[in-house]
A protein has these predicted regions:
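Membrane-anchoring hydrophobic helices of lipid-metabolizing enzymes
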Residues: 1-120, 125, 156-161
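Non-catalytic C-terminal accessory region of glycerolipid acyltransferases
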Residues: 2-3, 7, 38-41, 63, ...
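Surface-exposed charge patches
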Residues: 51, 131, 160, 218, ...
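Short, flexible loop segments at the rims of nucleotide/cofactor-binding pockets, characterized by
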Residues: 92-98, 163-170, 206-207
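A conditional alpha-helix N-cap/helix-loop micro-motif detector
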Residues: 96-99, 123, 151, 171-172, ...
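Catalytic core of membrane glycerolipid acyltransferases/transacylases, capturing the structured
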Residues: 112-172, 198-201
Length: 298
């Protein structure tokens, strides 16, 4: 990061570290203001969100769904600051912000030398939830699945921040590296509500068939890991409730379709606690059953 061509990114990293130290009240206020500014922008993303909300909350009126979209826009803007907090905030600035439940599930597995596949989903502040778990454990969570960025300076900046605060990172498609990490007794945070087109089953998500990756049980078996679920909700007071739970997936490792269905049911329940905090701009329903057109085509 000290090379001249990365100097600009170093400056961005310094600015991000400053923003990550903002008091929570300021973070929420800035996020709300930014959410308003974003409304005329990102029109393609808002179209995706509108389609998703129409599918998942079909019983609601258009007015009610627009209210949900506005809430989502505000939460999405706040989540940008939450990402910075996850990566750059000093531990002292996080004190008292979160209540973490279910740590005993992680400690029990560690005592047995067993890896933990910590499933989550496209919840917009998963990395901050991971950071809170790391702070509560007093050590990095252990492993974060991530995508790679094309710009080498951005890649180095984000990977260094994640590694320092959350734990070592594993590439999104490095399944061997993931399994090896789990076999060594590590924890791996993984958003498996993915649509990879190949290797999926259609299972209900808010009553809508959603193409869901069915390779997750194989990863858990290859890593000889138990499967747990991580979620977080931001309350109206700005404090967070982080929860690690047993989603009942260990018994379904030999039935990938049933595993995917149960996983989506658990994720749906987590989303239902704070619907504005799910990443509705994600094209969750882009792959459809045979004969059904993409809902995102205008």
């Amino acid at each position: 990061m000290s090379t001249p061509r990365c100097f600009g990114w170093r400056a961005i990293g310094v600015a991000a570290a400053v923003l990550a130290r903002l008091p929570q009240r300021a973070t929420l206020a800035f996020g709300a203001s930014l959410g308003v500014l974003l409304r005329p922008l990102l029109r393609r993303r808002w179209h995706v969100a509108r389609v998703n909300l129409a599918l998942c909350f079909a019983a609601e009126s258009a007015v009610e769904r627009e209210r949900r979209l506005r809430d989502h826009q505000r939460s999405l803007a706040v989540a940008l600051f939450e990402l910075l907090r996850a990566w750059f905030a000093p531990p002292a600035t996080l004190d008292g912000l979160a209540e973490v439940e279910g740590l005993s599930l992680l400690r029990d597995a560690a005592a047995k030398g067993q890896g933990v596949l910590l499933l989550t989903g496209h919840l917009m502040h998963t990395e901050l939830a991971t950071r809170f778990v790391a702070e509560a454990l007093g050590a990095p969570v252990g492993g974060v699945v991530r995508r790679y960025h094309r710009h080498p300076c951005l890649e180095r900046l984000l990977d260094a921040a994640r590694t320092r605060r959350l734990g070592p990172t594993v590439g999104k498609f490095d399944t061997r590296g993931m399994a090896r990490h789990l076999r060594n007794g590590g924890r791996l945070v993984y958003s498996a509500d993915q649509d990879f087109r190949d290797g999926h089953a259609f299972v209900p998500f808010f009553g809508v068939p959603a193409a869901t990756f069915v390779g997750t049980p194989q990863l858990a078996r290859a890593g000889r890991a138990v499967v747990r679920f991580l979620s977080m909700v931001r309350g109206v007071d700005g404090r967070y409730r982080v929860r690690v739970c047993d989603p009942g997936l260990d018994a379904l490792l030999d039935d990938p379709a049933a595993f995917a269905a149960q996983y989506m049911a658990v994720l749906e329940a987590a989303v239902g606690e704070a619907p504005d905090q799910y990443l509705w701009v994600h094209r969750r329903f882009k792959t459809r059953p045979p004969g059904e057109a993409s809902p995102y085509v205008r």
